[in-house]
Amino acid sequence: MRHYEIIFLVHPDQSEQVGGMVERYTKLIEEDGGKIHRLEDWGRRQLAYAINNVHKAHYVMLNVECTGKALAELEDNFRYNDAVIRNLVIRRDEAVTGQSEMLKAEENRSERRERRERPEHDGSADGDDSDSDSDNSDNADE
């Protein structure tokens, strides 16, 4: 069996169906003896260019180990499913199980956003405590 990285884009109006689609595709691969090494749902994202007058899509990425037969059946499912507007299958040399760069970048963005929001609240509270400590030490000297 070979390793593949599969990314497919689902029409934004069909986003509710993504869970069922992923379940159906993983079942198809596992029934043929394959394995799912990584599954990431990247959610709705802006497309770089419009596809059939659609500007957003729901992205899903799979890293799988499967037979050629299972991959061909999966590609047929993509081809005949109107909800899948694009798909990409890349053959990999080995299984990839770590987090994707896309997901890492998203987490970094959310962490930076949280850090930006925190100092406003934490900084003012720390500043008040240090002022009150210095006021107390001044009073102790008198």
Swiss-Prot record:
Q: Which GO terms describe its cellular component?
A: cytosolic small ribosomal subunit
Q: Where is the composition biased (Acidic residues)?
A: 125-142
| GO MF entries | small ribosomal subunit rRNA binding; structural constituent of ribosome
Record-linked InterPro entries: Ribosomal_bS6, Ribosomal_bS6_CS, Ribosomal_bS6_sf, Ribosomal_S6_plastid/chlpt, Transl_elong_EF1B/ribsomal_bS6
Q: Which UniProt keywords apply?
A: Ribonucleoprotein, Ribosomal protein, RNA-binding, rRNA-binding
- Which segments show compositional bias classed as Basic and acidic residues? 103-124
Looking at the record's lineage, which domain of life comes first?
Bacteria
Question: What function is annotated for this protein?
Answer: Binds together with bS18 to 16S ribosomal RNA.
Family under the similarity heading = Belongs to the bacterial ribosomal protein bS6 family.
What's the protein name? Answer: Small ribosomal subunit protein bS6
Gene for this chain: rpsF
